Amino acid sequence: MQPLSPAFIDQLCFDDIGLIPAISQDWLDGAVLMMAWMNRTALEQTLKSGQVHYWSRSRQELWHKGATSGHTQILKGIRYDCDADVLLLSIEQTGLVSCHTGARSCFFAEVNQHSQGDSLTLPPPMDACSELFRVIDQRHTTPEANSYTNKLLEGGDNRILKKIGEESAEFVMACKDDDEKAIANEAADLLFHLQVALAHHGVNWRDVLEVLANRRGAPRRN
């Protein structure tokens, strides 16, 4: 990432004690990871070092995230909201652990509307393709009876690649027919089977996202 100018800091609206909330988000799959506070010093140190620093309200000191645990956050980008009083940090989370509990995200509890204040422990919200791969990979490591995904994985390359060929042909035909609904459906089927192939070969969906992210803005090949 190119160094960011600290000039924008003067446009931010810090609260009465000089703090601003900062939400960190995974730079690849968009998962919301944690929320903490920054003051001007923390933000300036973040920009200078390229690693995220917060302000600890309990300890009243600068907090270099992950300095002790090793789970540092590498800054990829910063946005602020329309009122300039909340920061959104795009970060690469070292070790994929941002919460002190050992969870990937601090936002792992969702209130169950059918319960009385109980919560369910869930993975962080992320984009649909990343969530789909998470489920596929879970089937890969923890098979479930009568699972279509597991039947594909058990069939190996022969079964998986045959389905990719079939779904590719169906996608092409949908495009030839210019049927928007069919194109969307066939694209979804094709993406699913591509992800099954990735899981079968031990390639993480994040690896694909990282390739795409790194290609963004890169010189085009002839």
UniProtKB/Swiss-Prot annotation:
Q: Which UniProt keywords apply?
A: Amino-acid biosynthesis, ATP-binding, Cytoplasm, Histidine biosynthesis, Hydrolase, Multifunctional enzyme, Nucleotide-binding
Q: Which stretches of sequence are listed as region Phosphoribosyl-ATP pyrophosphohydrolase?
A: 129-222
**Tell me, what's a Pfam family for it?**
PRA-PH
Q: In which pathway does it act?
A: Amino-acid biosynthesis; L-histidine biosynthesis; L-histidine from 5-phospho-alpha-D-ribose 1-diphosphate: step 2/9; Amino-acid biosynthesis; L-histidine biosynthesis; L-histidine from 5-phospho-alpha-D-ribose 1-diphosphate: step 3/9
**Quick one: where's region Phosphoribosyl-AMP cyclohydrolase?**
1-128
Please state which protein family the record places this protein in: In the N-terminal section; belongs to the PRA-CH family.
Q: Can you cite a GO biological process for this protein? A: L-histidine biosynthetic process
Tell where it localizes: Cytoplasm
What protein name does the entry list? Histidine biosynthesis bifunctional protein HisIE
Q: Name one GO cellular component term.
A: cytoplasm
According to its UniProt entry, this protein's organism is Prochlorococcus marinus (strain MIT 9313)
